[in-house]
């Protein structure tokens, strides 16, 4: 059975969209089943309350049902950070027996750069280089954590 990934990422400019598509393709190539909220639900900026609630509920349900939350933290998108916090809250309070693996991807973090304290502490696996993506299946299968130990902000 494939591990189900909830793919949290900003997608508001061409660079973000390119990174999102590249990473989703890589995760699928690595054998993961990838849920993309952008592909499943799309909410226009002027959408009414009913559609907004449907999108919100659908995304929350998908986070609850995933095995892994993969969050692209480049750009510090508020929605992505909220999704990661929700997954961490589920781990802590709601479903502690079915712990989700939280992976943060930050390719724009410079060597020696500062990573957010809350993300550093809640992430099970931190990836800062695209080439390290190939390690992800083995890290998940082994249960190994790859925490961030650099400077924090």
What do these predicted ranges mean?
Residues 1-153:
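Conserved catalytic or regulatory cores that recognize and/or transform ribose-phosphate-containing ligands
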């Amino acid at each position: 059975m494939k591990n189900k990934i909830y793919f949290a990422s900003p997608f508001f400019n061409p660079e973000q969209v390119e990174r999102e598509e590249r990473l989703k393709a890589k995760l699928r190539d690595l054998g993961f089943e990838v849920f993309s909220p952008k592909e499943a639900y799309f909410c226009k900026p002027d959408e009414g309350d009913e559609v907004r609630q449907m999108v919100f509920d659908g995304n929350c349900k998908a986070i609850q049902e995933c095995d892994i939350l993969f969050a692209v933290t480049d750009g510090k998108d508020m929605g992505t950070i909220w999704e990661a916090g929700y997954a961490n809250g589920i781990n802590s309070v709601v479903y502690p027996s079915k712990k989700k693996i939280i992976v943060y991807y930050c390719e724009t973090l410079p060597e020696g750069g500062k990573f957010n304290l809350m993300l550093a502490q809640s992430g099970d696996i931190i990836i800062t280089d695209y080439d390290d993506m190939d390690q992800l299946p083995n890290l998940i299968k082994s249960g190994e954590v790859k925490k961030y130990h650099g400077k924090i902000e």
